[in-house]
From Swiss-Prot:
Membrane-traversing stretches: 1-21
Lineage: Bacteria, Pseudomonadati, Pseudomonadota, Betaproteobacteria, Burkholderiales
Flavoprotein listed as a keyword: no
InterPro entries assigned to the protein according to its UniProt record, in alphabetical order: TatA/B/E, TatA/E
Entry function: Part of the twin-arginine translocation (Tat) system that transports large folded proteins containing a characteristic twin-arginine motif in their signal peptide across membranes. TatA could form the protein-conducting channel of the Tat system.
The protein's name in its UniProt record: Sec-independent protein translocase protein TatA
Family under the similarity heading: Belongs to the TatA/E family.
Location of the region described as Disordered in the Swiss-Prot/TrEMBL record: 50-74
Cell compartments where the protein resides: Cell inner membrane
Molecular function, one GO term: protein transmembrane transporter activity
Subunit structure: The Tat system comprises two distinct complexes: a TatABC complex, containing multiple copies of TatA, TatB and TatC subunits, and a separate TatA complex, containing only TatA subunits. Substrates initially bind to the TatABC complex, which probably triggers association of the separate TatA complex to form the active translocon.
Pfam families from the UniProt entry: TatA_B_E
Biological process, per Gene Ontology: protein transport by the Tat complex
C-alpha cells in the first residue's frame, strides 16, 4: 500500500494530462518557475540591501551622546 510502482505514476500522469491538458500544465509550470525566480531575486536583493543599511545605522548612533536622568521610585 505504501509503495507505488511506475505504472501507478504513469496512470496518474495520464489522468492529470487528460483533465488539465498540456497547455494548462505548461502555463502552470511557467508561472511556478517565474515565481521561484522572482523569490530568489528578491532574497538576493534583500541580502545586499540590508548589509549597508546596518552599517550606516551603527555609524550615525556612535557619534551621538544621550543623557538620561533617573528619578527614585516611590
Amino acid at each position: 500500500m505504501g509503495t507505488f510502482s511506475i505504472w501507478h505514476w504513469l496512470i496518474v500522469l495520464l489522468v492529470v494530462v487528460v483533465v488539465f491538458g498540456t497547455k494548462k500544465l505548461r502555463n502552470i509550470g511557467t508561472d511556478l518557475g517565474s515565481a521561484v525566480k522572482g523569490f530568489k531575486d528578491g532574497m538576493k536583493d534583500a541580502a545586499t540591501d540590508t548589509a549597508p543599511a546596518g552599517q550606516v545605522a551603527n555609524q550615525s548612533t556612535a557619534d551621538q551622546t544621550i543623557d538620561v536622568q533617573t528619578k527614585p521610585k516611590g
